[in-house]
């Protein structure tokens, strides 16, 4: 009764708070007379505030009274200079969160998000110009539009808090049982939580710290959100970025794991909050998957806990998360332990014992590779390379009856499950649709390789980028596996040199030897000792040089090296634990210290020295490099790399074409036109050309492309209207259905086998 009463009270409180938050005021219209000059060079009339040949703050609004809540701020302007900027000032207590939005010359309207945790009577907008000679910027007006995002976010966070509170109360009153029944299990759970929380400390800041690729991946979340709102599922063409011209981020770079972050954005959460939740979730997944995989392999909670700490807090993983913001790579690292465990489980079958081969031993391996493929293609390629090398090394066992069928099942299942992503991707790659820079080759791998003395440094700074090897390592980002992994390899060598220790666990000795060998191979590939330049100079191997060059950076080999050397370190502790437990404890303590101290310092340095950045919405990522990086997925035909890509926001018609109607809604365009000439003429649309666009049937009008843009070609004398929209290809939908059926069949068959096993 008391619990039900508590739930009822919580419901009433949340409902009343939601109703209060949901009420919003009217739109605040800022007319030209409410915009006042700040600089002497600025003038104001009934058209707005104007400044010419000026750089700096030139105008502000009068004081604005804003109650707490969420808003969309719309700025109307005209600019023929460099990008201007609009910012928000909370005079009394600067608690507002907002985007420092740009005012680019090719547009006349900019929209950004504003969150006001507390009301303010003295808020204002400030406008900054960057105009040269004969360049002018006008601020013609603004609107501050209240939204309901504030109400939805407070309701959802309140529900989550109440759910956790109720669960804790039920546990304390013994109305429900704790899911972990043993004290040992609870200690393990707390240790895993501690590892995850420690690895997420920088997320506790009220902002984001700068990361090399952060804005690119935030743009992916925004594009995914816009695609879902436009009715795409799965999203393949992002309709929001690059001035809504359509960009195939989701098609070329799978973002299935970003869907929850996009859903949070749809529900009203800010972009940076959605990203923080994503990072925390992937960290939790890394902790859980690593512990599960290592525990299955070693049947030791202690070894699994140690390996989980070493891997989750490894230097290269934290560098990917907080220094590089390499979302794809650190997401893929969450699934590498599952690949290693899956391969071990397949080869661990012992048909010589007379036992029947495990029917589902291939499942973890297939799931692991699915996770890699849906996270990061380059990490998938590395995993395929090392898996193939292992299978060839053990070719006698590879081609035995229990192993080969399991490998084939895993490969077949992974292909079927991911066919929905692979078919469009392969079509674009085979047809050469996207630019995908081809400048990388084995010579570039050598230029990005790592010095051996740099590879196992204990500490590293959180700033800098990856420099050429010729420039030395001063001021460079961390490019180290960490001293802990080197110590783990050393401890394993000590173990195998002692016959008594080596014989204590033949499985651990074998696993450790293999992971040490392949781990050192990966480290060698990342080092300057690897003859990448010789491979580049070898004419017969140019195809191999270009293929490997797609990895872009030699230090990407740190990804498999980290995982493999962590397993090797666990093997060392397992070997000593069975024969010399005190030595095993000392080794584990040393490895933990060599991991936690550098990890803590890296995160401390990141928090205290990194630029603080706020991303509320896509408006904060308003630039070509910020949204798409090198533009690898721009159309091949379009050779522009500068800001001209941002232009062309309206259709451009040839002479003789009269455009009587034009509306654009995301990736759908409706137009009406007449070709008054006696030759074919075209209308260039503000959409990039990619296969998957279709036009309503119209005799005399055809959908073509030129210079990377979609064009509608009109026959002489043609008159009428057409609609161009993104639909994708019919066989993509067929691949979607095959993948969906394959996943459903796997789930049904697995559940059926589990029920049958329970009855045996």
PLM features: what roles do these ranges have?
Residues 196-335, 342, 371, 377-378:
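Active-site lumenal/periplasmic loops and adjacent helix-entry segments of GT-C-fold
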Residues 24-30, 406, 411-499, 620-643, ...:
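Periplasmic/ER-lumenal interhelical loops and adjacent helix-loop junctions
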Residues 149-151, 178-180, 643-760:
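Active-site-proximal, structured, solvent-exposed surfaces of multi-pass membrane proteins
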Residues 382-415, 491-505:
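Perimembrane helix-loop-helix junctions
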Residues 11-19, 195-207, 226-233, 269, ...:
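Membrane-interface helix-loop junctions at the exits of transmembrane helices
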Residues 337-361:
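Membrane-interface transmembrane helices that cradle and orient dolichyl/undecaprenyl
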Residues 1-18, 150-202, 509-510, 590, ...:
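Start-transfer (signal-anchor) and selected internal transmembrane alpha helices
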Residues 342, 361-376, 410-416:
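Membrane-interface alpha helices of multi-pass inner-membrane proteins
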């Amino acid at each position: 009764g008391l619990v039900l009463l508590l739930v009822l009270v919580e419901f009433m409180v949340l409902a009343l708070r939601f109703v209060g938050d949901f009420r919003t005021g009217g739109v605040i219209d800022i007319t030209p007379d409410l915009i006042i000059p700040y600089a002497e060079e600025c003038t104001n009339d009934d058209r707005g505030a104007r400044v010419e040949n000026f750089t700096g703050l030139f105008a502000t609004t009068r004081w604005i009274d804003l109650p707490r809540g969420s808003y969309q701020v719309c700025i109307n302007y005209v600019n023929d200079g460099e990008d201007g900027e609009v910012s928000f000032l909370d005079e009394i207590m600067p608690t507002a969160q907002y985007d420092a939005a740009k005012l680019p010359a090719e547009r006349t309207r900019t929209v950004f998000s504003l969150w006001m945790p507390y009301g303010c009577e003295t808020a204002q907008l400030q406008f900054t110009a960057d105009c040269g000679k004969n360049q002018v910027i006008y601020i013609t007006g603004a609107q501050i539009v209240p939204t309901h995002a504030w109400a939805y976010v407070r309701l959802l966070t309140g529900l989550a808090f109440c759910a956790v509170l109720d669960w804790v109360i039920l546990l304390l009153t013994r109305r429900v049982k704790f899911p972990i029944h043993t004290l040992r299990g609870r200690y393990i759970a707390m240790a895993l939580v501690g590892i995850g929380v420690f690895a997420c400390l920088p997320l506790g800041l009220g902002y984001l710290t700068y990361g090399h690729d952060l804005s690119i991946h935030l743009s992916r979340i925004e594009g995914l959100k816009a695609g879902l709102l436009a009715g795409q599922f799965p999203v393949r063409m992002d309709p929001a970025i690059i001035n809504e011209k359509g960009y195939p981020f989701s098609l070329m770079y799978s973002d299935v794991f970003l869907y929850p972050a996009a859903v949070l954005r749809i529900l009203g959460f800010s972009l940076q909050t959605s990203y923080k939740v994503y990072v925390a979730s992937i960290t939790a997944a890394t902790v859980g998957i690593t512990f599960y995989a290592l525990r299955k392999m070693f049947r030791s909670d202690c070894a699994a806990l140690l390996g989980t700490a070493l891997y989750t807090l490894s230097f290269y993983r934290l560098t990917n998360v907080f220094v590089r913001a390499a979302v794809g790579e650190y997401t893929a690292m969450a699934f590498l332990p599952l690949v290693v465990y899956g391969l071990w489980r397949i080869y661990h079958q012992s048909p010589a014992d007379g036992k029947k081969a495990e029917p589902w031993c291939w499942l973890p391996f297939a799931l692991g590779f699915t996770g890699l493929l849906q996270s990061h293609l380059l990490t998938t390629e590395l995993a395929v390379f090392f898996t193939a090398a292992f299978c060839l090394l053990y070719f006698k066992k590879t081609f035995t009856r229990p192993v080969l069928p399991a490998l084939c099942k895993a490969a077949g299942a992974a292909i079927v499950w991911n066919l929905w992503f692979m078919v469009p991707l392969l079509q674009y790659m085979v047809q050469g649709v996207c630019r995908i820079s081809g400048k990388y080759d084995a010579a570039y791998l050598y230029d990005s390789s790592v010095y051996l003395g740099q590879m196992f440094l204990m500490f590293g700074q959180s700033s800098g980028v990856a420099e050429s090897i010729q420039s030395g390592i001063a001021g460079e980002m961390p490019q180290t596996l960490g001293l802990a992994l080197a110590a783990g390899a050393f401890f394993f060598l000590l173990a195998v040199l002692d016959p008594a220790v080596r014989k204590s666990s033949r499985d651990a000795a074998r696993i450790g030897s293999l992971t040490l060998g392949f781990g050192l191979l990966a480290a060698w590939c990342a080092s300057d000792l690897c003859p990448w330049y010789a491979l580049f100079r070898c004419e017969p191997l140019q195809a191999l040089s270009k293929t490997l060059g797609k990895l872009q950076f030699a230090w990407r080999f740190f990804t498999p090296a980290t995982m493999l050397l962590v397993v090797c370190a666990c093997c060392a502790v397992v070997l000593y634990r069975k024969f010399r437990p005190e030595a095993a404890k000392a080794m584990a303590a040393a490895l933990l210290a060599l991991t936690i101290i550098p990890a803590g310092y890296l995160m401390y340095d990141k928090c205290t020295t990194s630029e603080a950045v706020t991303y509320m919405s896509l408006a904060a990522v308003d630039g070509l490099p910020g949204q798409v990086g090198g533009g690898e997925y721009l159309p091949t035909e379009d050779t522009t790399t500068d800001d001209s890509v941002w232009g062309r926001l309206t259709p451009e018609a040839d002479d003789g074409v009269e455009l009587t109607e034009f509306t654009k809604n995301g990736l759908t365009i409706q137009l009406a036109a007449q070709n008054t000439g006696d030759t074919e003429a075209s209308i260039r649309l503000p959409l990039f050309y990619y296969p998957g666009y279709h036009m309503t049937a119209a005799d005399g009008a055809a959908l073509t492309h030129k210079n990377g843009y979609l064009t509608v070609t009109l026959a002489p004398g043609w008159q009428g209207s057409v609609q161009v929209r993104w639909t994708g290809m019919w066989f993509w939908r067929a691949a979607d259905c095959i993948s969906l059926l394959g996943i459903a069949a796997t789930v049904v068959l697995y559940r059926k086998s589990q029920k049958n096993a329970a009855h045996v």
